[in-house]
C-alpha cells in the first residue's frame, strides 16, 4: 500500500504520461512498449532498476526522478509530481 496513493488514478496517470511507449504494462490500453522492461508482476519485484530496494516511497521517488536515484539510467524524468508518482506507484504495486 502506498500512503496517499490511489491505484485507479495511478493507472490513468500512467496512460497520460505515456509510460506504455517504453513499457508493456498490464491493464493499460496500448501499453506495449519494448524499450524498457515489462512492468508485469511489478508488485512482486524486490528491486527497482535491478539495484534499488522496491518499497513504496522509493518507487514514488524513482518515478519522479530516475536519474537522481540511479545515474546513467535510460529512464528519463518525465515531469511527474510527487503526488502523481504516489498514485502511479500504488497502481504498479497491484500488479502481481
For each feature predicted by the language model, list its residue ranges:
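Alpha-helix capping/termination and helix-coil
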Residues: 17-18, 46
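Gly/Gly-Pro-rich "capping" loops immediately C-terminal to redox-active cysteine motifs
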Residues: 7, 11, 24-60
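Extracytoplasmic/periplasmic, Sec-exported soluble proteins
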Residues: 2-6, 51, 80
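Axial heme c-ligation environment in periplasmic c-type cytochrome domains
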Residues: 21, 33-38, 42, 62-95
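Flexible linker/context regions in extracytoplasmic redox proteins
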Residues: 2-5, 21, 58, 72
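Residue-level signal for short amphipathic helical patches enriched in basic/charged
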Residues: 14-17, 70
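Electrostatic cytochrome c docking/interface patches
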Residues: 1-15
Amino acid at each position: 500500500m502506498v500512503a496517499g496513493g490511489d491505484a485507479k488514478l495511478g493507472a490513468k496517470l500512467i496512460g497520460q504520461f505515456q509510460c506504455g511507449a517504453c513499457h508493456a504494462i498490464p491493464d493499460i490500453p496500448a501499453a506495449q512498449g519494448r524499450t524498457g522492461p515489462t512492468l508485469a508482476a511489478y508488485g512482486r519485484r524486490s528491486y527497482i532498476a535491478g539495484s534499488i530496494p522496491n518499497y513504496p516511497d522509493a518507487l514514488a521517488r524513482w518515478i519522479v526522478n530516475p536519474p537522481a536515484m540511479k545515474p546513467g539510467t535510460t529512464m528519463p524524468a518525465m515531469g511527474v509530481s510527487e503526488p502523481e508518482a504516489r498514485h502511479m506507484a500504488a497502481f504498479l504495486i497491484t500488479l502481481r
